[in-house]
Every structure is written in structure tokens, then in C-alpha cells.
Amino acid sequence: VEPPLAGQPASVFYAARHRHSDRACWQARLAAGEIWRNGQPLLLDAHLASGDRLVWRRPPWLEGPVPADFQVVYDDGDLQVIDKPAGLPVLPAGGWLEHTLLRLLERRHRGAGAAIPRPVHRLGRYTSGLLVCARQPQTRAWLSASLRESTAAGLAGAAAAAAVGSGAAAVGEVGGCRKLYRALVVPGALPLAPGETLLINTAIGRREHPQLGQIWCAATGSQPGDLAASSSLTLLECSPQADLVQVAIASGRPHQIRIHCAAVGAPLWGDPLYGPGGQAAPAARPGDGGYQLQAWRLELQPPSGGALVLEAPRALGVMALMAESGR
């Protein structure tokens, strides 16, 4: 505690420094023994002295249940590709620490005498499908660079293709790495027949959001911080309840597939956040589920050589949802 702040009650001190909680909340934390002064619990809302050392011993948060089953699709002893279930966070963040794929991998492989496979990239919590991991740091670095290079080259190639009105199939195919996603979107909204492809070049930028301050959504591309983004969307199947699409992305922007589908008037079926136009609903958050999005196919050239082509074995929760809905 610095001299100008001496004499304040502890609750006033904390409420002024940490505005996420009011004074009454800090008084409750004092009573619970969470605040320590000079190595001892400060159970009363005492006035502070200059030089006091305060520690807030925050209790661990409660993490909700997540699906903990995942299938290993490929493993060569270094590179590992898994089929991540929807609802499982990949890395600790946003209130998730132990109930994450990273922690599951650490617990599964700890004590096995080999390096632990660790994720090379992210998938959204409610995105299922293929996730690339690697045991050796140099392999993770190589794969991460390969993914970045294919994304950057794909974005440049998509822009060039758009300028001449063709070449959408090149999106996501550059640099020896290709990723394809599948998703359910609201029915009848796309100006496509099955098998036809649409190139989407809507920019993505941060805009005001009442809950989060700012959030990523569709943008004009004219404001500072707006990011160029490109996706190639192909309509695969139509049904009265939902349409099945395949998407290749040439830029790894936040929530890109959700935003781009919504931007062209075909939001992901069940997406509570992004509606037609690609703007964010004020009452929803990015981590809210309900949509069906899958990292379906992966093509890459591993450091060991050769070509690796994998598809998610769960043939899409999308198809399961169609069956459950009586399609």
C-alpha cells in the first residue's frame, strides 16, 4: 500500500483498484478469508497502513462439464491428429483451465515416457473435427509456419482470383496445406445450386458490443483495424430445415466461417451470435454453442515426407442433426 492510499478501508482500496467488484463484494471476500495482509488473513474491513502487503487468494473457479472423449485419427510418434468433439475447449482461456484438450492430453500421456503431443492451432470450443498436434517443438514450429504461410498465400491468391472472377477453388490449397470445413446453415438463403461455389471477401473487424466492449464481426474494410478475409463456400446439400455447406478459408480471422456465412445471409444453423449480415447479437457471446461446424478434411505434407490426407471420422454432427430432426 503506497502512502497516499493509507487510511482507507481494505474494501474501498480493492473496489477502487478492481472495478469488476463493488465494495460489498470485497467485504464478503474479506469475511471469507480471501484477503491477506502481511502474511495473515484480514477478516475485518480494517484501515490500511502505508507499506501493508496485500494478497487476494482467489478461490479456484468451477469449470462446467465438457466432453472428454476424443479419437486419435493419426499418430506417427511425433505428429498426432485428433477428432475433437464439439464443446471441448482446446487451450486454457475464458474460465477453462483443467477441462481443456491440452490438459486431457497432458494427463493421458504423462508418465508414458514420451513427449506430450500439444496443439499446433486452435479450433473454437463448439467446432468439432480435425486438430493437429505435435510432440517435438521443431515440428510444432514447422507446422505452425506452414499453416500461416498457406493462409497468407491463400489470401493473396483469393484476392487475385477475385480480380479475374475465377479461381475460388484455390482458396486454402496453397503451401502444401489444405483445410476444409463443413457446416449447417439456414436453408434456402444462398443464391447457389448444389455444387456451386461462392467466394466471400467480407472484411472482419472489431465493433462495439454491450457485454464484451468489442467483438469481431463483419466490417466494411474502411475502418482502422479491419482485416481482409476470404472464404470459398460450396453448397453441398439442401433440405427444408438446413443446408450443408463446405468452406475453405484463405485467412485465419476470428470466427471467420460464422461471420462470412452470416454476412452473405446464411448464418450457421443455431448460431446465437451472428445473424444475417454478420453483425453480433447484443445478448450473445462467442463461446455460446448451438451451431454445427466441423473441421472435416486436412491435407498436408508432414516433415517426414509424403502426403497426408485425413477426414474426420464422425461423418459430421451435421448429418446426425439432420437425422435427429427427421430430415
Where are these regions (language model features)?
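RNA pseudouridine synthases
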Residues: 1-327
